[in-house]
Amino acid sequence: ARVALESCPRVRRCLVVDGGDAVRAFGDPRCVDFEAALAAQPDTPIADEWLGTPMLYSSGTTGRPKGILRPLPENPPSEPLPLFHFLNKLWQCRDGMRYLSPAPLYHSAPQANVALAIRNGGTVVIMEHFDPEAYLALVERHRITHTQLVPTMFSRLLKLPEAVRRRYDLSSLEFVVHAAAPCPVPVKEQMIDWWGPIIHEYYGATEGLGFTACNSQEWLAHRGTVGRVLAGKLHVFDDAMKELPLGTPGTLWFETATPFEYFNDPEKTAEARSGDG
């Protein structure tokens, strides 16, 4: 808490779990024991009891990360967002699941998957940084059932000596998903040979405009696919923004009813839209 307050002078309140006497000894009025702060809150519902939502930032693939601002959902806190139900079914989440996150939580995908696991009453294990053998050891030690990786992590796992790869029991794995970058066909073939047909893939963006997904069987039948469209409507345009026929290479655009804008950046917001909005 001391480091957080000294590093971020504009922070107005720092809640400390199990703070107690240490918080009082610290003497900074911004530093408050969590239990004391909770006890001071009224137990009556507030007038406008709607669920909030985080403002996620893009990963910065095309430049600096951009804040993605959406209208607040009109959901009471007791009801999960529709996206939760969608991903919960797609990712085969369940009570007692054990999720391993090898990626940082400032990215939307790991953050969403961690939240899904917690909301299902599951256990979450978070790596401070990815190490391929340490990852395998964590899967075995915690009997991990669900995890998400990126293709680079697949490649690093496959580069481990065969003896190291066989050293760990990975039989608890039920659902492995990857995204974020194109996965070379030989890499994915080797991963399916190693872990079995439990590897899923999706294509999307932090903006949440559209979503495609496929399982191992679908991918093996159409190697290189990122699956069928499950959210949004997909269009393929040429450089002149003319829609192209099926099977023609071009730029992918998603048509969606989900509004968003880039925080404090109307120019980037306009660039992200086609001429008809």
Question: Which role does the model predict for each range below?
Answer:
Residues 2, 67-69, 123-129, 200:
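Short beta-strand->loop structural element characteristic of the AMP-binding/adenylate-forming
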Residues 4-55, 72-84, 160-161:
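ANL superfamily adenylate-forming
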Residues 36, 54-56, 119-120, 144-149, ...:
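Gly/Ser/Thr-rich phosphate-binding loop
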Residues 55-70:
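Conserved adenylation A10 loop of the ANL superfamily
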Residues 66-70, 80-89, 99, 136-138, ...:
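Adenylate-forming
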Residues 73-98, 102, 106-146, 160:
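Conserved AMP-binding/adenylation subdomain of ANL enzymes
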Residues 133-136, 165, 270:
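Short hydrophobic/charged patches on amphipathic alpha-helices used for structural packing
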Residues 228-229, 242-273:
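Conserved ATP/PPi-binding loop(s) of AMP-dependent carboxylate-activating enzymes
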